[in-house]
Amino acid sequence: MMFRLTSVSCFLLVIACLNLFQVVLTSRCFPPGIYCTPYLPCCWGICCGTCRNDNSSLTFLQFCLPFFFFLRPSHPLFLLLPAR
């Protein structure tokens, strides 16, 4: 019984350590020009599919509008644009 309890607790400890390493190793940001998502953020600037520098006080849509013009109407990101 003691061997089983020890092996189970070691197994759970290994799983907890692996989860901790995953969080530590994936908590990073990306420089300009690299692909980004809300879960893989930019170090600075705005994520418009790729990280872009924001050197002004532009809003998200003003800054990302050139990127959105290249999207097809069936693309999910196209729905973020205001109705015309």
UniProtKB/Swiss-Prot annotation:
Q: Which cysteines are joined by disulfide bonds?
A: C29-C43, C36-C48, C42-C51, C47-C64
Chief site of localization: secreted
A single GO cellular-component term on record:
extracellular region
Indicate the residues removed as propeptide on maturation. Answer: 71-84
Query: What tissues harbor this protein?
Result: Expressed by the venom duct.
Keyword Secreted set for record: yes
Keyword Transmembrane helix annotated:
no
Alphabetical keyword list: Disulfide bond, Ion channel impairing toxin, Neurotoxin, Potassium channel impairing toxin, Secreted, Signal, Toxin, Voltage-gated potassium channel impairing toxin
According to the UniProt entry, where is the signal peptide? 1-26
Q: Name one GO molecular function term.
A: toxin activity
Where in or outside the cell it occurs: the entry states: Secreted
Q: Print the domain comment field.
A: The cysteine framework is XI (C-C-CC-CC-C-C).
Primary role: Inhibits the vertebrate voltage-gated potassium channels Kv1.1/KCNA1 and Kv1.3/KCNA3.
Give the UniProt family note: Belongs to the conotoxin I2 superfamily.
* Record's protein name: Kappa-conotoxin-like Im11.3
State the organism named in the record. Answer: Conus imperialis
What taxonomic ancestry is recorded? Eukaryota, Metazoa, Spiralia, Lophotrochozoa, Mollusca
